[in-house]
Each structure stands twice: as C-alpha cells, then as structure tokens.
C-alpha cells in the first residue's frame, strides 16, 4: 500500500507565485465592474463618518515615488476606517492652474502670441485634463480606491466659483488689499512668487563694503565721517534711500589712517579683518547709540540723493557692519522700516529683471549683470572699500530653479497680520501625530509675512476686481458674488471673453465712472489660493463630505504650502481650521539617502515597480518605512520587500491548503474544547489583532510590517504550522485534534487576511477568493476583526514553554552537528529540572510533548546525571530515538506492528489507515 495516498496533504488553487503584475489588473477590473468603492460606502451608510481630504497633486508629468507614498498612505487609512465601519468617502483631487502648464505648452510648440488669451487658456485646460487621466490611471494601478470617476479639479466651474466666494468674504472683512510692496519676484517666470514657491540653493554673489559720506551731521557725528554698509546685492545700491542702525546697539567712530568710519562696535574686529585694516592704526574716537544716530543724513555714493540714517529692530550683529543698506523697493524689512519714515519705494527693474529708464545709466542691463557696473562706478567714486565673492544660500524659483529677487510692484495681498493670532489659535486646537508638526506650522504662520496672492500670468483664476474710470478699485460683495455666479455657470474663461461691463451686475453704476466705463484686473490668483480653497470647493459642496475634514495628509513641504494656505482661508472665512488632524510624510530618497536624479541614475518610479514587481510590493514597501522622516528606496530594498512578501504569501497559502476540507459552520470546535496549544495560538492571534488595530489607529504601519513578520515567522512558521503538519497530514480527517487545529487555523487565516487587506489589497482579495465559506464577496467589504480580551495566564504559561522549546531546539542542533541525529524526528529528548528551572513540574500539564517539540519521544525526569547539558529551562539530553521509523508519519516507535497487510506503521497510523480501508 502507498501510504502517501492516506495522508491529508494541503490542497488549494491559490498559486505559490504571485504574478502580481498580471494578476492585479484582473482584480482591479473586477472591483471596477462591481463598483466596489460605492458598495463599501453603502455598507456603512448612516454610520460615523471619517473624511480624509486629498491634497491635490499638480496635473503635470508622470507620478514619482513621492506621489505613490502619499496616495498609498492615504489608502491604508481610508480602507482601514471603512473596514472599521466608518462611512469614509475618498475624493481624489487635482491642482490644475499655474506656470508649469503654460511652460509645458510652450515646449510643445504652442505659440500663445498667435491666439487670444481665452484660446490659450482653453489649450491649458485640455492639457491639464489629459494629464489628470494619465495620473488617474497610475494611481488606480497602485490599488488606491476612491471616487476617481468624479474627482475634484480646481478648474471646474463650481470649484472656481467657491474660490471667488472665499476671496469675496476675505475682501469683505478687509483682508484683501492692493499695495506696492517688495515681493519675491522671479525674472525667469516673470511673476511674483509666494513664500511656498521659494526654495534655497547655494549661489555665488559679490560681497561689497561701501562708504557713505556724511552730508548733514546733525551735530552728532563728525562732518567728515563715513558710514560703512555691507551688501551681497550691489545692483540694489541705485535704489538706496537710507542706512538703518539698531537703536540700542553701540556704534563707534573709528579713525583708520585719517579716515573716519562709523560701524557697530560689536562688529569692529570682523570689519577690520575683512577690510585688512592694521589694528595698530585703528582708533576709537567717539561712541554713540543707534538712537543718537537717527536722522543723521548721508550722501548716496554716486547719485544726487540723500541717504537718511534711521532706526530698525531688524539690524543684527550676525554679519556686516551694523549699518544696513536700505532699499525699500528691494527688501521686506527695508520696506517695513521705510514706511515708518515715509521713505520713497524705488524699484527700477522690469518683469524680466532688467533695469528700466528709472535706473539711469544702468538702463537695459539685467540686474545680475549690473553688479559689475555698480561696483566699477563705486570704485571710480572712491566709495568701494572691498569687493569679494561668497557662496551662500539664496532664494530660487521652485519651478525654474533660477534666482529670485525682491522687487516692489503693485500686487494684491491677503492680510496675514490681521488673522495671524486666530490661525495660531486654530493650530493649537488641531491634533498632530508628532509635536514637531505643530511647532513647524505654528512657527511658519507666526513668522510669515503678508501673502502675495496676485500673479502676472494667464492660466489661473482671475482676481474678481474692477477699476472705475478714476482708478478706484471696485471689489464689493455684490460684484464679487456676481462674478462667482458667472464662473459657476460658464467657468473662469468668461473673464477673458467678455468686457468688464458685461461681467458686472446688470445696471451697475459707480461714481468713479461717470461714463459707465470699467476695466478689469489682469492678474490671476496664486495657485496656493486655488488649492487652499478646497475646503469650500470640495468639503462644503460635495454631499458625501463634510467640513472640517478629519484629516489632511501630505508631504512635509506642505507645512508652508497647502496646510498653510488652507488654514489661512478657512480661519479667515469660517473661523476654524479645515482639518482636525494633521499628518505629514518625508521625501523619497535613494538607498543611500541621496536625492533621486536622472544624472545619478538612481531614479525609481512607481510605473517601474508596478510592472516589474506589482503594486502590492510598492504598498508593502510603504508600510516598511518610517514615513514621518525621509524614506529610502532602491532595487535592493525592493528585493528585501519582495522576500518578505513571498514569506507572507506562502504562509497564507499553507493555511489555505490545510483548511480545504474544513467547514467552520459544521466542523468548528468550541473554544472551551480546543486543545490548549490551539487556545494559546488563538490568544496570540487576539494579541496580534489588538496590537495591529492599535497600530492602524495610530498610523504606525512600520510596526504592523514588523509584527506581521514576527507573528508569521516566530508563532506560525517556526512553531505552530511546523508542529501542525503531524496533525493536519497524519491524523484522522474528523479527529478532535485535527478539527481543533483547523478551527484556529481558519480563524488565523481569515483575521490575518482582513488585517493585511488595507496594505496588501490585491493579495488579500486573492486569498479571500480562495478561502472557503467566507460570508462577504470581498475582503474589502468585510469588517476588521474585533479586539477580544486575552487569557493572560495562558499566554504567560506558553511563553515559558516556548522559551523551553528554544532550549530543546538548541540541544537538537548540537546533537545534529555531533551526528547523533539527522532530522529532529530521529530524536529522543530527556528533560529534567535544574537549579534554574523546575522543568519536571512545569511540564506535567502539557500533553503530546513529542509533537510540540517535533521529535519522536520525550521523557521528563526529576534529575539527570552530569552528562546532561544545563539550559535556562532545564537539563537536556538528546539521544537517537528508540524503535523504528513509521513509514507513514516518520516518527520512531517501539510498537511498529503488522496488522493484516499494514506493516511498519506506528499504532496511531495503524488506526487511521484501518479506518480508511
């Protein structure tokens, strides 16, 4: 007889190899055909809601790993919340306006000069919508579930209308104003930039020390003294109108070889070193406070213009001379202090960064090229004391990567100062995963200047502002709401298609326009105002959503971006934060922690991972990262992730194979009647479940990743499943011992599949489809396992046993190395108590020790002789097992017998086989 035929071997159609790149699209097609997104919502309708509001990615270009990290993290959260019974709709969004799309069209050969603004904008819209379709497909391929058939898009008429209404409400509260102020200006983009659009890179700049002669000493300083200023922007010297000193700093008049120079005393050594002064020839002649120097008048070094000495608290002794070159047209601090002294705002630079006619002899020069011309002129006038070059961190345009300047231009602003405290209070009432997140956004809002919301471009939402014939600004509740209504009906392109009078309410009149003529604003809104309006355009307008959102989750760069603009517009109009909880993630780096770049050849993109390995590998990788900081990815890291995936898959497959003949409705054993080892595993499952649920609640996916591996490797592979083979394959099909184990195995399989479902979405679904007798058609429509109290005494007892088992395994390994045994079933184990542990007493309550240790025979005695090896949990001796090997179960037995034609079988196998014959 072939005894193999009598074994109950695992059976399942669940394949060993994942084949994810081919399998996943098939699973996704099924989800789409069944409209699983809405099915999941319907299941939880009327339950408590959970709203994760999607920050809109920019609709341009292919997805990078940062996109994947972001969307997969969001999907973990929404899927988990759904399986916990929450009504958790997820509406993905896209940010669609702005310069990159204009530039992309130009690169494609679209000549905007050959068409009207409205026509060019239409092409921008077409391009953005094409990009959305491409990105949408890629997001869905990652297994992200959401309302992709009806996403929110910032160019949709209803969204633009909501944005205009926010603008109107802010204007109504006096928070929107126009002013000529220095703003970040990008000559390469020909537009103003918000702080969120600035990034810092190293730049080589001229460093100059310049002497300003005293023109009117006011009886304070010597008439022939000179103030020394230091700057790294020589091109701004033509705009100088003042020298700022700190009112409380001490200043000295130093005689250096007959020349008298005024600088801060705290910086005198640094200045002397920079200007190569011989210290022996330096003499401090007079001392003043900055307050005493106020209103002294200096002479501009090469223009017929005075430079007034003024006081400012922004002056520091970190660098320079303590006498700060002040040009209100080219610096925020300069502008603010200049306002107090009613100084003129001079900014002779055009949109391209070129000097205008107001720049005199520098007219036509690009500002950076003018640096040399200015220093040459200063040298000619004898005012340049030192020219050097330094490399320093300097603001750049985040899109073009070119340097930006401060330039005073007429711009529209949203007042931060008027709502700053309200925003800070709202931040205090917001929850954060980590305290540094709160500190980061709090400090950014606290230190933030006014928000420049105007842009000198065409692809964006127009500022709904009109001008009367006399130049008066028209921005009333009536006019703004009328524009919002027009945008809601026609879209914002109507602004560029109609005359101003046709955009105003019918019969509108204004005293500043006696002839009934009006003009409209040509600037558009900052794209951060677009996305920052999503709480109104999406949360408050979509019936399935609600305001405020439970959560915003984006990259850490959004503390100064979307998180910031959203809370600003929300607090300004609604008085509360648009999010209750804020979570951020880091950036994706290569395996060595370097930034990915084509030049380094270290770029990994989602499409590549999905096609080569599958979306579930990308998702498992996300769960393996400490995403709060920057994360790493490489081929080697993905290989390690694939190895972990393979272990998870094979473990699930083993369990599937061994419950193929089990029906939980008819074959389950009540918990009270389970074998103790099975009750131990059931309690370990409950412990693992509680920990996993807690980790999901706290967004700690790395803990889940590690604990899943630990549970699979330590509890299942190394013990329970290995121990179980002797029972599942060998014992009688309906025996109590086998059904007891299958009862627990089935529970582990079902619960683990559910717990893994938010992460391994496709694999969990595939496992579910092969699991017999499950009630729900999809694991994603099932509920998470409930957290059940564990039997702690049982767990403690079995943890001690598992430690003893580790000692036995160490002893077996030694015996194997000494050729006493080969496989563990060839072993006979004798265990005795020792000074460290009373093993003989402890083991009296355990049955079938030979099965638990996966050996043939176990003997427990009170004491062993000196030949025994002492371990932490007893003295252990390993010998070769007595008797002969059973041909069916491979255990050694002294009772192999011949019953009829059944030879070389142990008593257990004889009994099982006889029942089959």
Curated annotation (Swiss-Prot):
Cofactor(s) demanded: Zn(2+)
Catalytic activity line of the entry: tRNA(Ile) + L-isoleucine + ATP = L-isoleucyl-tRNA(Ile) + AMP + diphosphate
Binding locations of L-isoleucyl-5'-AMP: 554
Cofactor: binding comment: Binds 1 zinc ion per subunit.
Pfam family membership, one: tRNA-synt_1
Keyword Transcription regulation listed: no
Biological process per Gene Ontology, one example term: isoleucyl-tRNA aminoacylation
GO molecular function: aminoacyl-tRNA deacylase activity; ATP binding; isoleucine-tRNA ligase activity; tRNA binding; zinc ion binding
The protein's Enzyme Commission number: 6.1.1.5
Top-level taxon of origin: Bacteria
Enzyme class name: ligase
Keywords: Aminoacyl-tRNA synthetase, ATP-binding, Cytoplasm, Ligase, Metal-binding, Nucleotide-binding, Protein biosynthesis, Zinc
CC per GO annotation: cytosol
Annotated Zn(2+) binding sites: 886, 889, 906, 909
Cited function: Catalyzes the attachment of isoleucine to tRNA(Ile). As IleRS can inadvertently accommodate and process structurally similar amino acids such as valine, to avoid such errors it has two additional distinct tRNA(Ile)-dependent editing activities. One activity is designated as 'pretransfer' editing and involves the hydrolysis of activated Val-AMP. The other activity is designated 'posttransfer' editing and involves deacylation of mischarged Val-tRNA(Ile).
UniProt remark on domains: IleRS has two distinct active sites: one for aminoacylation and one for editing. The misactivated valine is translocated from the active site to the editing site, which sterically excludes the correctly activated isoleucine. The single editing site contains two valyl binding pockets, one specific for each substrate (Val-AMP or Val-tRNA(Ile)).
Subunit structure, as described in the record: Monomer.
Designated name of the protein: Isoleucine--tRNA ligase
Gene: ileS
């Amino acid at each position: 007889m072939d005894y193999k035929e009598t074994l109950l071997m695992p059976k399942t159609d669940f394949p060993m190899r994942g084949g994810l790149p081919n399998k996943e699209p098939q699973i996704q097609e099924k989800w789409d055909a069944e409209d699983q997104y809405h099915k999941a919502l319907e299941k939880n309708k009327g339950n408590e809601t959970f709203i994760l509001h999607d920050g809109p990615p920019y609709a341009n270009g292919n997805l990078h790993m940062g996109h994947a990290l972001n969307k997969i993290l969001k999907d973990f959260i929404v899927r988990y919340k759904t399986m916990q019974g929450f009504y958790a709709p997820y509406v993905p969004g896209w940010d669609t306006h702005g310069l990159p799309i204009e530039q992309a069209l130009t690169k494609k050969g679209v000549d905007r000069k050959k068409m009207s603004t409205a026509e060019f904008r239409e092409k921008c819209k077409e391009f953005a919508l094409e990009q959305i379709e491409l990105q949408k497909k890629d997001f869905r391929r990652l297994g992200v579930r959401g309302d992709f058939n009806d996403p929110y898009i910032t160019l949709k008429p209803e969204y633009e209308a909501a944005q205009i209404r926010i603008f109107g409400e802010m204007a109504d509260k006096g928070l929107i104003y126009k002013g000529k102020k220095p703003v970040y200006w990008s000559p390469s983009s020909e537009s103003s930039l918000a702080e969120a659009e600035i990034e810092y890179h190293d730049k080589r700049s001229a460093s100059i020390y310049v002497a300003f002669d005293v023109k009117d000493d006011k009886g304070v300083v010597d008439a022939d003294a000179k103030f020394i200023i230091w700057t790294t922007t020589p091109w701004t010297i033509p705009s100088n109108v003042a020298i700022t000193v700190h009112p409380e700093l001490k200043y000295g008049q130093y005689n250096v070889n007959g020349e008298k120079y005024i600088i801060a005393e705290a910086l005198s050594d640094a200045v002397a070193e920079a200007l190569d002064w011989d210290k022996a020839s330096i003499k401090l002649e007079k001392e003043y406070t900055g307050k005493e120097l106020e209103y002294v008048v200096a002479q501009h070094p090469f223009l017929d213009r005075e430079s007034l000495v003024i006081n400012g608290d922004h002056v520091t002794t970190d660098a320079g001379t303590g006498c700060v070159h002040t040009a209100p047209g080219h610096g925020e601090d300069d502008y603010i202090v200049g306002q107090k002294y009613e100084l003129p705002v001079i900014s002779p630079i055009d949109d391209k960064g070129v000097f205008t006619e107001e720049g005199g002899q520098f007219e036509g020069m690009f500002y950076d090229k003018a640096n040399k011309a200015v220093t040459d002129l200063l040298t000619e006038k004898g005012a340049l004391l030192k020219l050097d070059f330094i490399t320093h961190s300097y603001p750049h345009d985040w899109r073009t990567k070119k340097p930006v300047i401060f330039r005073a231009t007429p711009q529209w602003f949203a007042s931060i100062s008027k709502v700053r405290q309200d925003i800070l209070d709202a931040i205090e009432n917001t929850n954060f995963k980590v305290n540094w997140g709160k500190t980061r956004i709090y400090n950014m809002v606290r230190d933030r200047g006014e928000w420049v919301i105007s842009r000198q471009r065409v692809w964006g939402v127009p500022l709904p502002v009109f001008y009367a014939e006399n130049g008066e600004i028209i921005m009333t509740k009536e006019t703004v709401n009328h524009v919002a209504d027009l945008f809601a009906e026609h879209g914002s392109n109507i602004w560029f298609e109609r005359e101003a009078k046709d955009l105003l309410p019918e019969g509108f009149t204004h005293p500043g326009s006696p002839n009934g003529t009006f003009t409209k604003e040509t600037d558009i809104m900052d794209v951060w105002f677009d996305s920052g309006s999503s709480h109104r355009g999406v949360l408050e307008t979509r019936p399935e959503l609600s305001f405020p959102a439970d959560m915003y989750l984006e990259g850490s760069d959004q503390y100064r971006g979307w998180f910031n603009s959203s809370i600003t517009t929300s607090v300004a109009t609604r008085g509360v934060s648009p999010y209750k909880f804020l979570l951020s993630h880091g950036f994706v780096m290569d395996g060595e922690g370097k930034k990915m770049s084509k030049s380094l050849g270290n770029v990994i993109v989602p499409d590549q991972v999905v096609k080569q390995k599958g979306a579930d590998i990308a998702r498992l990788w996300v769960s393996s990262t400490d995403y709060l900081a920057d994360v790493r990815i490489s081929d080697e890291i993905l290989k390690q992730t694939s190895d972990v995936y393979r272990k998870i898959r094979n473990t699930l497959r083993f369990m599937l194979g061994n419950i193929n003949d089990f029906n939980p409705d008819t074959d389950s054993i009540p918990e009270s009647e389970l074998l103790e080892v099975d009750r131990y595993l059931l309690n370990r499952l409950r412990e693992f479940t509680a920990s996993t649920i807690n980790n999901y609640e706290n967004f700690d996916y790395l803990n889940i990743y590690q604990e899943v591996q630990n549970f699979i490797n330590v509890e299942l592979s190394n013990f329970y499943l290995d121990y179980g083979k002797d029972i599942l394959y060998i014992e009688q099909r309906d025996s109590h011992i086998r059904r007891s184990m299958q009862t627990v195995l089935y529970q582990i399989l079902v619960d683990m599949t559910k717990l893994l479902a938010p992460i391994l979405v496709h694999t969990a679904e595939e496992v579910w489809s092969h699991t017999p007798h499950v009630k729900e058609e999809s694991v994603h429509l099932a509920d998470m396992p409930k957290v059940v109290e564990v039997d702690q005494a049982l767990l403690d007892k079995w943890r001690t046993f598992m430690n003893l088992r580790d000692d036995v395994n160490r002893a077996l390994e030694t015996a194997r190395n000494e050729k006493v045994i080969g496989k563990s079933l060839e072993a006979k184990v004798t265990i005795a108590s020792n000074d460290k542990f009373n093993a003989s007493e402890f083991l009296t309550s355990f049955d079938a020790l030979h099965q638990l240790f996966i050996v043939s025979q176990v003997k427990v005695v009170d004491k062993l002789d000196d030949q025994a090896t002492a371990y932490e949990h007893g003295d252990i001796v390993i010998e070769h097992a007595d008797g002969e090997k059973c041909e069916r179960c491979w255990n050694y037995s002294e009772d192999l017998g011949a019953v009829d034609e059944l030879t070389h079988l142990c008593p257990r196998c004889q009994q099982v086989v006889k029942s089959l014959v």
